[in-house]
Amino acid sequence: MNNLTQGKFITFEGGEGSGKSTQSQMLYEYLKSQNTPVILTREVGGTIVSEKMREILVHEELLPMSELLQAMAARYDHMVRKIIPVLKEGYIVICDRFLDSTACYQGLELENGIDLVYNLHKTLMPPLMPDITFFIDVEPDTAIKRVNLRNMSNKFDIRGIDFYNKIYDCFKELSNRFPARIKTIKASDLSMLEVHELIKKHL
């Protein structure tokens, strides 16, 4: 699906408290140190318009379909305005969350929602999928303890262990469904640097 770009598209996925944002940043800093053309972005967000949509999505309680469509609209703006242009210039794009997060966070709230998310992406979005996705696999019990230490939170952070388990199981399911693309990094008992080194081995 990536025949319209020259660069490489890397995404990081995982539940709240998994450390995926930290690993996204660490990989970005590493590639920059190697003089590799690279940008770091995130979803929901990444552009002025999408960041405004993010504020609604992560703080307001929306109807499930409204939340899904909000996420998809933000992604379209992000892809067209930012991701695809820099990929065409040969950059590596690192994105903290992408389509798989939408499947798990929004898709699970709808009947046949996971398949719906991927079908909507295929139908509505430009023909682009990640070249590689890193699923940072951290057990929910560990993840929720990390989140409880944060000073800031959104509506997803403060949901209980049942929600964390559901999201975790969803990412595990997706890693089994798309094994060629999604690389699972078992990170519960590893340091940040150890996780980073494992990620580098897949590049």
Swiss-Prot record:
Gene name in the database record: tmk
Binding site for ATP: 14-21
Enzyme class, spelled out: transferase
Keywords recorded for this protein, A-Z: ATP-binding, Kinase, Nucleotide biosynthesis, Nucleotide-binding, Transferase
Signal peptide boundaries: none
GO biological process annotation, one example: dTTP biosynthetic process
HAMAP family per UniProt: Thymidylate_kinase
GO MF term set: ATP binding; dTMP kinase activity
Protein name: Thymidylate kinase
GO cellular component: cytosol
Disulfide bonds: none
Catalyzed reaction equations: dTMP + ATP = dTDP + ADP
InterPro entries listed in its UniProt record: P-loop_NTPase, Thymidylate_kin-like_dom, Thymidylate_kin_CS, Thymidylate_kinase
EC number: 2.7.4.9
Function as written in the Swiss-Prot or TrEMBL entry: Phosphorylation of dTMP to form dTDP in both de novo and salvage pathways of dTTP synthesis.
Family statement drawn from the similarity comment of this UniProt entry: Belongs to the thymidylate kinase family.
